[in-house]
Protein backbone atom coordinates (compact mmCIF):
# COMPACT_ATOMS: atom_id res chain seq x y z
CA UNK A 1 0.00 0.00 0.00
CA UNK A 2 1.41 3.35 -0.98
CA UNK A 3 0.77 6.60 0.91
CA UNK A 4 -1.61 7.78 -1.81
CA UNK A 5 -3.83 4.75 -1.16
CA UNK A 6 -4.27 5.47 2.56
CA UNK A 7 -7.53 7.32 3.14
CA UNK A 8 -7.72 7.47 6.92
CA UNK A 9 -5.32 6.63 9.74
CA UNK A 10 -6.01 5.77 13.36
CA UNK A 11 -3.28 5.28 15.96
CA UNK A 12 -3.53 3.50 19.29
CA UNK A 13 -1.31 2.11 21.99
CA UNK A 14 1.52 3.67 23.96
CA UNK A 15 2.97 5.44 20.95
CA UNK A 16 -0.25 7.01 19.71
CA UNK A 17 0.62 10.47 21.04
CA UNK A 18 3.99 10.52 19.29
CA UNK A 19 2.63 10.07 15.76
CA UNK A 20 1.43 13.42 14.46
CA UNK A 21 0.03 12.44 11.05
CA UNK A 22 -2.97 10.38 12.16
CA UNK A 23 -6.56 11.38 11.50
CA UNK A 24 -7.61 10.02 14.89
CA UNK A 25 -6.18 8.69 18.16
CA UNK A 26 -8.05 5.99 20.10
CA UNK A 27 -7.07 4.46 23.43
CA UNK A 28 -6.15 0.79 23.69
CA UNK A 29 -9.11 0.31 26.02
CA UNK A 30 -11.58 1.48 23.37
CA UNK A 31 -9.86 -0.57 20.66
CA UNK A 32 -10.04 -3.76 22.72
CA UNK A 33 -13.71 -3.11 23.44
CA UNK A 34 -14.54 -2.51 19.77
CA UNK A 35 -12.50 -5.45 18.51
CA UNK A 36 -13.84 -7.97 21.01
CA UNK A 37 -17.46 -6.80 20.79
CA UNK A 38 -17.32 -6.92 16.99
CA UNK A 39 -16.38 -10.62 17.15
CA UNK A 40 -18.45 -11.55 20.20
CA UNK A 41 -21.39 -9.35 21.16
CA UNK A 42 -21.96 -11.46 24.29
CA UNK A 43 -18.58 -10.43 25.73
CA UNK A 44 -18.88 -8.55 29.03
CA UNK A 45 -15.36 -8.86 30.49
CA UNK A 46 -12.08 -8.55 28.62
CA UNK A 47 -8.76 -9.61 30.12
CA UNK A 48 -5.84 -8.33 28.06
CA UNK A 49 -2.43 -9.73 28.96
CA UNK A 50 0.08 -7.83 26.86
CA UNK A 51 3.82 -7.51 27.02
CA UNK A 52 3.83 -4.22 28.93
CA UNK A 53 0.57 -4.21 30.85
CA UNK A 54 -2.52 -6.14 31.83
CA UNK A 55 -6.02 -4.72 31.55
CA UNK A 56 -9.43 -5.90 32.71
CA UNK A 57 -12.29 -4.16 30.92
CA UNK A 58 -16.02 -4.41 31.69
CA UNK A 59 -18.36 -3.95 28.74
CA UNK A 60 -22.00 -2.92 28.67
CA UNK A 61 -24.61 -4.72 26.58
CA UNK A 62 -23.93 -2.28 23.75
CA UNK A 63 -20.16 -2.90 23.85
CA UNK A 64 -19.36 0.37 25.60
CA UNK A 65 -16.63 0.47 28.23
CA UNK A 66 -18.29 0.56 31.66
CA UNK A 67 -15.16 0.25 33.76
CA UNK A 68 -11.55 -0.86 33.51
CA UNK A 69 -8.44 -1.36 35.56
CA UNK A 70 -4.90 -1.47 34.26
CA UNK A 71 -1.60 -2.69 35.64
CA UNK A 72 0.99 -0.59 33.86
CA UNK A 73 3.35 0.29 36.70
CA UNK A 74 5.25 -3.00 36.90
CA UNK A 75 5.72 -6.23 34.96
CA UNK A 76 3.80 -8.43 37.44
CA UNK A 77 0.98 -10.23 35.65
CA UNK A 78 2.13 -9.22 32.17
CA UNK A 79 3.71 -10.94 29.20
CA UNK A 80 7.05 -9.62 30.41
CA UNK A 81 6.58 -11.64 33.61
CA UNK A 82 6.00 -14.74 31.46
CA UNK A 83 9.18 -13.99 29.49
CA UNK A 84 11.24 -13.62 32.67
CA UNK A 85 9.84 -16.85 34.12
CA UNK A 86 10.56 -18.72 30.87
CA UNK A 87 14.13 -17.43 30.86
CA UNK A 88 14.76 -18.44 34.48
CA UNK A 89 13.23 -21.86 33.80
CA UNK A 90 15.43 -22.19 30.70
CA UNK A 91 12.34 -22.81 28.62
CA UNK A 92 11.29 -21.17 25.34
CA UNK A 93 8.31 -18.87 25.95
CA UNK A 94 6.27 -20.90 23.45
CA UNK A 95 6.81 -24.03 25.60
CA UNK A 96 6.06 -22.46 28.99
CA UNK A 97 2.38 -23.42 28.86
CA UNK A 98 3.15 -27.06 28.14
CA UNK A 99 5.76 -27.14 30.91
CA UNK A 100 3.28 -25.69 33.42
CA UNK A 101 0.61 -28.21 32.39
CA UNK A 102 3.06 -31.02 33.20
CA UNK A 103 3.34 -29.81 36.79
CA UNK A 104 2.05 -32.25 39.39
CA UNK A 105 1.60 -29.53 41.98
CA UNK A 106 1.41 -25.75 41.96
CA UNK A 107 4.38 -24.34 43.84
CA UNK A 108 3.33 -20.99 45.32
CA UNK A 109 5.12 -17.94 43.96
CA UNK A 110 4.19 -15.38 46.59
CA UNK A 111 6.08 -12.36 45.27
CA UNK A 112 4.13 -10.22 42.84
CA UNK A 113 7.18 -8.17 41.89
CA UNK A 114 8.86 -9.75 38.86
CA UNK A 115 12.37 -9.18 40.24
CA UNK A 116 11.54 -10.82 43.59
CA UNK A 117 9.51 -13.58 41.90
CA UNK A 118 12.55 -14.35 39.75
CA UNK A 119 14.65 -14.79 42.91
CA UNK A 120 11.93 -16.95 44.44
CA UNK A 121 11.84 -19.19 41.35
CA UNK A 122 15.63 -19.56 41.43
CA UNK A 123 15.39 -20.55 45.12
CA UNK A 124 12.73 -23.18 44.34
CA UNK A 125 14.84 -24.62 41.53
CA UNK A 126 17.95 -24.66 43.74
CA UNK A 127 15.95 -26.55 46.36
CA UNK A 128 15.20 -29.28 43.81
CA UNK A 129 11.63 -28.34 42.91
CA UNK A 130 10.83 -29.46 39.37
CA UNK A 131 10.71 -26.92 36.57
CA UNK A 132 7.16 -28.03 35.74
CA UNK A 133 5.89 -27.41 39.28
CA UNK A 134 7.60 -24.01 39.39
CA UNK A 135 6.13 -23.11 35.98
CA UNK A 136 2.68 -24.11 37.24
CA UNK A 137 3.21 -21.83 40.23
CA UNK A 138 4.29 -18.92 38.05
CA UNK A 139 1.21 -19.28 35.85
CA UNK A 140 -1.05 -19.56 38.91
CA UNK A 141 0.47 -16.40 40.39
CA UNK A 142 -0.40 -14.44 37.24
CA UNK A 143 -3.96 -15.78 37.31
CA UNK A 144 -4.29 -14.75 40.96
CA UNK A 145 -2.98 -11.26 40.21
CA UNK A 146 -5.41 -10.82 37.31
CA UNK A 147 -8.33 -12.14 39.37
CA UNK A 148 -7.59 -9.50 42.00
CA UNK A 149 -7.67 -6.82 39.32
CA UNK A 150 -10.89 -8.24 37.87
CA UNK A 151 -12.55 -8.09 41.28
CA UNK A 152 -12.15 -4.31 41.20
CA UNK A 153 -14.27 -3.95 38.05
CA UNK A 154 -16.52 -6.98 38.49
CA UNK A 155 -16.45 -10.07 36.32
CA UNK A 156 -19.42 -10.92 34.19
CA UNK A 157 -19.49 -13.67 31.56
CA UNK A 158 -18.63 -13.95 28.70
CA UNK A 159 -14.98 -13.46 29.62
CA UNK A 160 -12.70 -12.95 26.62
CA UNK A 161 -8.92 -12.95 26.86
CA UNK A 162 -6.78 -10.93 24.46
CA UNK A 163 -3.11 -10.15 24.02
CA UNK A 164 -0.22 -12.53 23.56
CA UNK A 165 -0.93 -14.02 27.00
CA UNK A 166 -4.08 -15.56 25.51
CA UNK A 167 -1.82 -17.89 23.51
CA UNK A 168 -0.66 -19.53 26.76
CA UNK A 169 -3.14 -22.37 27.33
CA UNK A 170 -2.01 -22.96 30.91
CA UNK A 171 -2.72 -19.31 31.75
CA UNK A 172 -6.16 -19.50 30.13
CA UNK A 173 -6.96 -22.62 32.20
CA UNK A 174 -5.63 -21.10 35.43
CA UNK A 175 -7.53 -17.88 34.84
CA UNK A 176 -10.78 -19.74 34.08
CA UNK A 177 -10.41 -21.60 37.35
CA UNK A 178 -9.44 -18.51 39.34
CA UNK A 179 -12.25 -16.33 37.92
CA UNK A 180 -14.85 -19.08 38.18
CA UNK A 181 -15.90 -18.52 34.56
CA UNK A 182 -14.74 -20.06 31.29
CA UNK A 183 -12.35 -17.79 29.40
CA UNK A 184 -12.99 -17.53 25.67
CA UNK A 185 -10.21 -16.94 23.14
CA UNK A 186 -11.17 -15.31 19.85
CA UNK A 187 -9.17 -15.47 16.61
CA UNK A 188 -5.89 -13.53 16.63
CA UNK A 189 -6.10 -12.43 20.28
CA UNK A 190 -2.69 -10.76 20.15
CA UNK A 191 -3.90 -8.10 17.69
CA UNK A 192 -7.39 -7.56 19.10
CA UNK A 193 -6.52 -4.09 20.40
CA UNK A 194 -5.25 -2.96 17.02
Question: Where do the model's predicted regions map?
Answer:
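Conserved phosphate-binding catalytic cores of ATP/NTP-utilizing and phosphoryl-transfer enzymes
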Residues: 14-50, 55-62, 147, 151
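Phosphate/pyrophosphate-binding loops at sites that engage ATP/ADP/AMP, CoA/4′-phosphopantetheine
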Residues: 1-7, 146-157
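Glycine-rich phosphate-binding loop plus the immediately following alpha-helix
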Residues: 62-105, 190
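Adenine-nucleotide phosphate-binding core of ATP-dependent small-molecule kinases
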Residues: 117-150, 189-192
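Active-site nucleophile and cofactor-binding loops and adjacent substrate-binding regions
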Residues: 24-33, 47-51, 69-77, 136-139, ...
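Glycine-rich phosphate-binding loops at beta-strand->alpha-helix junctions
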Residues: 14-15, 150, 155-178, 186-192
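N-terminal glycine/serine-rich phosphate-binding loop of ATP-dependent small-molecule kinases
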Residues: 1-29, 173-184
Amino acid sequence: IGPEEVRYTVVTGYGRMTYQGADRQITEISCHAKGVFHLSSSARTIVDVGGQDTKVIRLGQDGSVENFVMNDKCAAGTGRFLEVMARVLDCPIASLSQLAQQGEEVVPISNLCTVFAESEVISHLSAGVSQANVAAGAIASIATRITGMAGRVGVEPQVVMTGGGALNGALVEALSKSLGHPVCILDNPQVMGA
